Amino acid sequence: MRFGIADAVMRPLPSPPSMPTRFFNTYSRQLEEFRPLDPAGKCVKLYTCGPTVYNFAHIGNFRAYVFEDLLQRHLEARGFEVERVMNLTDVDDKTIRGCRQLGVRLADFTQKFKDAFFDDLGTLRVKRATHFPAATEPRFIARMIEMIAVLLEKEIAYQAEDQSLYFRLSKFPEYGKLAHLNLDELRPSGRVQSDEYEKENIGDFALWKAWDEADGDVKWDSPWGPGRPGWHIECSAMATALLGPEIDIHCGGVDNIFPHHEAEIAQSESVTGKKFVRYWMHCAHLMVEGQKMAKSAGNFYTLRDLIEKGWTGREIRYALITVNYRLPLNFTFDGLRAAQSALGS
């Protein structure tokens, strides 16, 4: 008996119990069978790193968000109930610089880009997360201060002469395991360098940044004086406040692995004493026409730029999922045209 493609499509798939869900875990660099923390094996706690709302999100960002959307849909199709958190970073150097340049309040500056982000998610048909916490919400600022206080009490954190607080990497020997780096070989670069005030060791990262004039009116009171949270503690606080000390899956782009996700592990596990995340999943970089996306190269696109050029959300979404999430994606206009043809639009 011969079978055609239509017959193969119509044949029932094996029942879920015979097909265990497996994910590639960045931490172990291996495919692992997925077993949720929930004793009933039903509920999944998923944390995904969201945007820094200082500008419109670009297509590189949305590659990760569409991947995370597919992950959630896959889990739900497998019968899991997903509680997903996607954070909004609404206070950092970029957001402060942006609001000060325009002479507006930080909250007013970031709200424009929060609203735009939610509109863009709708354009790409990305499911809404269960929670979209913003770093500046009072309950999360309180959680950050609480966590830092615990780290100070354990002497894992310290206050420098400039009144900023730092995490002592020497107190967390597991640091670097996610990125598979040797702690002794780490050298500061990029966002790590921006955390340098007056530290005991060059690798120590900021937990709380003491206020200075460049921050304008962006500051919160704390037991250590006015200031603002470091980037890393924001996610640790929001994740543990909403999902508890242990999370099933944590996602993000590969650029988040170091130092951000390494720092999250160090902070969270030092406070709670529990394994922070069981499965780490990271989306690879997106290039445009074979080159790194950059405004200086003229190949930097927000989702809105592409919509203005006449492409639809469906076509862009299709183009973003044509390559395995762990492989770099070369985003091209030929690829968009292929997506358009495949969708019959």
Regions found by a protein language model. Give the residues of each.
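Short, solvent-exposed turn/loop segments enriched in Gly/Ser/Thr/Pro and often Arg
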Residues: V85-D92, A134-P138, D255
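Alpha-helical recognition segments enriched in aromatics with Gly/Pro capping
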Residues: G4, M10-Y54, D69, A142-G344
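Short catalytic-loop micro-motif centered on adjacent basic/acidic residues
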Residues: R84-V85, T130-A134, H250-G252, R337
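Short secondary-structure capping/junction motifs at helix and strand boundaries
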Residues: G122-A134, K154-S164
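The substrate-binding groove and active-site-proximal loops of carbohydrate-active enzymes
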Residues: R100-L106, F132-E137, G253
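Aromatic- and histidine-enriched alpha-helix N-cap/loop-to-helix transition segments
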Residues: R63, M86, R139, G230-E234
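N-terminal, positively charged nucleic-acid-binding surface of large information/translation enzymes
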Residues: S28-L31, L37-K127, M147
